Amino acid sequence: ILFMIFHHVFGLYALPAGVDTAWIAPQLTKAAPIFKICVPIFIFITGYAMGWKTNSSPTFGSLIKTGFSHYFKFWKIYFLCLLLAILVSWAFPLPILPSVADMGWKNGLLVVTGLRPCYPDWWYMALFAAATMALYPICAWITHHIAPVPSMAALLGVSLLFQSTAHIPSLPGIAYSFPPFLPCFILGYMCAFLASRLSALSISQSLGAILLLALEILSIHLFSFSKAKTLTVIFLFTLWCLPWITRKLRLTPLLTLLGTYSALMWLNHRFIFGYHFSWDLYGTQSISVVFIVTLVSSLLLAMAMQKL
């Protein structure tokens, strides 16, 4: 969540038009897109969380129900923020943002369901919907009804195939944004699947699974569309070590706090503090002030919204 806020505040396309940003060092604006590593991390965590949610003998219907339930919890947070966004956009209209009132019923329905969010920064909502309600049931059914290691090898191959379509401009909406992050979801799911069943696998199956994980990491590094390929791999490895790191550095309370409100912070920080009040915020000409005010304000707003 810290990386995401930093990326949205100081990214190449985040700086608001008409605001004096000459005080921001050029190297900072060039380095800020590296922080978009938050998207692979989010989708990895989604896959990891979903990998633990499958029972021993699932039906495809039960898997779809589980995926929908997971998405619905997130959607309730999204819908609350959508209502707040509509109120803010009516009170402080901006020409760069779409008006919900001007949308037809089809686009309005897509906005409400989260399949086509009205705010550009909320595009991950559609990615999350595809991951939980489509990709998860398919992955879970395949790995539970076919030998686990061969099925995961097949998923790895499919993920690379879809990732190769990442730069096809004719793919609309979610079909265009999803393929680059598909291997990260598969990796997260594979890690959870193996962690929950490693004791039941034979030695050869365990070695095969470890090899597949290594190939998956390598594929993310070699085929990723992101310029921060090496950082992607480093941070995915860091996620595995996170429990040990947080204990050693005594960061557990802080990370727990940010994790509890991360979804609300992701949805609220940009449309209020990135669009509507950015002129006053960037006018301070202080990187620390802009980042800290955005972070703290977003956290406090998330805590207040959590009580609704």
List each model region and its residues:
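Structural signal for the C-terminal ends of transmembrane alpha-helices
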Residues: 50-58, 91, 137-144, 164-165, ...
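Alpha-helical transmembrane segments of multi-pass membrane proteins
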Residues: 2-16, 86-92
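Membrane-embedded glycan-lipid processing machinery
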Residues: 31-38, 115-126, 169-179, 222-227
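Solvent-exposed interhelical
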Residues: 132-158, 190-208
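Alpha-helical transmembrane segments
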Residues: 1-5, 77-81, 152-159, 208-214, ...
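Alpha-helical transmembrane segments and terminal signal-anchor/GPI-anchor hydrophobic tails
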Residues: 161-266, 270-294
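Transmembrane alpha-helical segments and their boundary/interface "anchor" motifs
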Residues: 23-26, 32-43, 52-117, 131, ...
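Hydrophobic cores of alpha-helical transmembrane segments in multi-pass inner/ER membrane proteins
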Residues: 40-48, 127-134, 183-189, 236-241, ...
